[in-house]
Amino acid sequence: MPELPEVQHTADSLGIQIAGARIARVERLDWTRMVETPSPDEFIRLLTGRQVRGWDRRAKWILLFLDDGWTLALHLRMSGSLTVHPAEAQPDKHTHLALRLEDGRQIFFLDPRKFGRARLLDSAGLAALDAAHGDEPLSDAFTVERLASLLRNRKRAIKPLLLDQSVIAGIGNIYADEALWRARIHPLRPAADLSAAEVAALHDGIRAALRQALANGGSTLRDYRNSYGAGGTNQEHFNAYDREGRPCPRCGATIIKTVVAQRGTHYCPACQAIPSATTNRRE
């Protein structure tokens, strides 16, 4: 699933290309379950003729700000991508939403697994989407102290907590593994048991893993492409994720893959060992 870096690159590469453009019509919507709100018919009616005024990202949602206070929110889920094409381009069978711009260009929402979602939101709907998600981990407000407050008194294992979009927004399986590796924290550690030093290391690890991925254009393992059709290279720089059976870049121990909260999880058993029960509680 595209995570914060991939969604950010998609939002930026799409927004740069279509800012100021007007949506002439919805050319294709052949998987109506993609549209969460409003009804598919209303979605088509309200979207027609709207101008793209700007763009942003919230959590793993791409936000296209339209005129008259509407926002088109798009979620790529597992296999989605958004690309811009010339007028004569023909969508393939996996393109379930196609928008025709007034200048003739087209926006294709390609989604082989049909998990992608679209919402057309008014100001109240946008506020609700924002409120449903937690802290943005690259924002100035996401300090070490803020992370400590989010983890305090939470007995959940740290990895599923990092994946909880209502707590911290935008982190998925890849960057949870990478952040925990950087911080030398076992993915099953209870969040509340992390020491102050470990919380600081995790804060640094989260931001470093995400910033590295942004600098490398995101991670392309299977489907991810930005809106120019280009993949990322961050997968060439993984330290733990997708490295089962390979040596840890830091200590040389063999990276292990296990399952945590029903998610494949990669970690180093030496660097990320679980410490004794009473030595690491936060002061």
UniProtKB/Swiss-Prot annotation:
The EC number(s) this enzyme carries: 3.2.2.23, 4.2.99.18
Cofactor mode of binding and number, as noted: Binds 1 zinc ion per subunit.
Residues passing through the membrane, by range: none
Binding annotation for DNA: H94, R113, R154
One Pfam family per UniProt: zf-FPG_IleRS
GO BP terms: base-excision repair
GO molecular function, one term: damaged DNA binding
SUPFAM superfamilies: Glucocorticoid receptor-like (DNA-binding domain), N-terminal domain of MutM-like DNA repair proteins, S13-like H2TH domain
NCBIfam families: fpg, PRK01103.1
Family designation: Belongs to the FPG family.
Role of this protein: Involved in base excision repair of DNA damaged by oxidation or by mutagenic agents. Acts as a DNA glycosylase that recognizes and removes damaged bases. Has a preference for oxidized purines, such as 7,8-dihydro-8-oxoguanine (8-oxoG). Has AP (apurinic/apyrimidinic) lyase activity and introduces nicks in the DNA strand. Cleaves the DNA backbone by beta-delta elimination to generate a single-strand break at the site of the removed base with both 3'- and 5'-phosphates.
Protein name according to UniProt: Formamidopyrimidine-DNA glycosylase
